[in-house]
Structure formats: C-alpha cells, structure tokens
Amino acid sequence: MSASLVGSEMCIRDSNEAVFEVLEKKKGKDEAVLFARSATAGGQKFPVHWGGDCWSDYESMEESLRGGLSLQLSGFGFWSHDIGGFENTSTADVYKRWCAFGLLSSHSRLHGSTSYRVPWAYDDEAVDVLRSFVRLKARLMPYLWKTALTAHNEGIPSMRAMVLSYTNDKMCNYLDKQYMLGDSLLVAPIFNDEGIGEYYLPKENGIWTDFFTGRQQEGGDWYTRTYAYTEIPLMVRPNTVLPLGNSEEGPEYDYADQVTFRVYDVQDEAAAEIYDMDQNKVASIVVKRIEDKLVIDCDSKKPFTVELVNTGILDVKGAKASKENKNTILRDCESHIECIQ
C-alpha cells in the first residue's frame, strides 16, 4: 500500500474521529452522532454514514440502496441517504417513493443541492405521503431502537442484505433491491413510475404478513402488485412480536407506555423486548403456541395491548378480547394471558 493511500485513510479516520469526539464532548457520552460520507477501516464506530451526492431519479435511488447494503455488509451498523436525491430536483413521483424508502431506513433526512426537499414544494399528496411514513416510523421506534442497540452491541447492521439474514437461501445471494430492517421487517422500495412493487419472500416456518393490509403470503416465492404512494412492500416475518409505540409525533417518548404488541403467526415461540434511552430493558413479552392455545407472558410496569393478527380466539383468560376485522385485540391485560383458538 502506498504512503499516500495510507495517509489518506488515516486522514479520513482521524477527521471523523475528531468530529465525533467534539460532538461527544458537547452532547455527552452516547449522544454523539455525525453524518459522514467518507470512511475507511475503523470508521464503523463513528456513525452515521450516508450515500453521498446522488442524482434525483429512480436509477440513483436504486443504486443508493445497493451501495448502502454493501456498506452495511462491511460492518457499518447505520446508513442514510438524501430523500429525493441530491443533485437536481426529482419529480414528485420519485420524491414520494423515496419518502417511503427513506423513512424505512435507519436514519432519515430531507436534503438536496438545488432546491428545498420539503414535501409542499412538490404537491399536496407529497405532504400526506411524508406525514404517513413519519408517523409510521415514530410508532416503530420501540422496534427500531432495539434494532439500533443490536447494531451497537453486536455489530449486526440495522438494514440487512437478504443474504445476511438468510444465508441458506440461495435466492437471497443476489437480492439487492430489498432488505431486512431488523430481524422481522422486509422492505422492498419501489423504483419505477408505475408503482409496481416486486419482492421475494424467503421460505419460513409460517406465513409472511403485509404490514398494511394483513394479507398473508407464503415464503419461497416472488410477488408483484401495484402500490399507492402511501404504501410500500413491508412484510412481517412469521413468528414475530412487533412492538408499536403509542406516539406518532416524534422519535423520543416512553416506548413501554401503552405499547401495542402485534403478534404475527406464532408457530412455536416469539418474543420482544423494549428498552429506554438509557438502554435499560423496561418491558418484555413471550408468546408460546401450545397446540390450540397461545400463552402470553409480559413483564411490564406500564399498560399494554396485544393484537393477534389474522387470529380468531374462542376464549381468553387474563385480558378482555374484542374482534377488529380479522384481528383479535386484547386489552386490560394481565401479566399472564391464555388464548384458546
């Protein structure tokens, strides 16, 4: 390796480290975050990195995801990109699709070179689209915060190439237009002006569920359909307990207070944990299937709700049950609940 290359890498690492240390000194330990597009070996410990100055079109949006997944396979736990692209100004169509992708990334920001990326600069629908995905991300924060802690403590990235989550599924080896957001959510951004979403669901012990519609789909196959701007292929892995927070107004709130635990197609056992901003575990839940019975044990000092997705219940002990569409909602929950199907 040449001396000039070594010097360049040291400069990149040292500059990111220096800025991070200044932020840490100013904001306090565990509060420093920088946005960097430069990186080299060792730069993984100074997040967040973003994709740089891409063009504002579908091709660049797609390439941004491809590069981001490659970066995270290199040990970078967090990654961001400029919603709507950076160079030039995107069409309203591209912007609205990028909003969905951007808000379902580990970090999200509106940024560009020649124009403001605020949604009302595009059209009224863009405001509605951005608002809906901001609210979704706010509700997902108990899950996303746990995912972030996993990235920090274990080195498993928050946005995962499919091959990382499904090492034994050869179909996943080359998939670079979809990803796992944490353990349980599969995201497939839309990269065309027809609104066509196409994605592959790996084979699982159970059935995948569309987050928005509740539609169930078997793994081991490809799926295609057209999506509105307020939708995106967002599939929930079977055997999942997904915590949804009680706030749509911002990312910081009491994640355990009045949380809703959504239970998706538990075949054997599934669990979830909620952590506060100081990384203390403040709630946990375990759901077990025993023949025709679901047994739920939750450790929480705050009130919570359980939503059994696509599940009908005949008898419940330890909670009050009501039917909403195809789901069963459990309220006034005790720490131990038994549900007979």
Please describe what each predicted stretch is.
Residues M1-G7, C11-I12:
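Single conserved hydrophobic/aromatic residue that forms the stacking wall/gate
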Residues S8-E9, G52-W55:
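Glycine-rich tight-turn/loop motif centered on a GG-T
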Residues R13-N16, V22:
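Alpha-helix-loop-beta-strand connector modules within alpha/beta enzyme cores
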Residues F20-V33, A39-H49, S60-E63, G67, ...:
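Catalytic core of carbohydrate-active enzymes
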Residues A319-A321:
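Small-residue (G/S/T/A) turn/hinge positions that recur once per unit in extracellular repeat modules
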Residues K326-R331:
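A generic structural motif
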Residues D332-Q341:
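Surface-exposed interaction regions enriched in Ser/Thr/Asp/Glu
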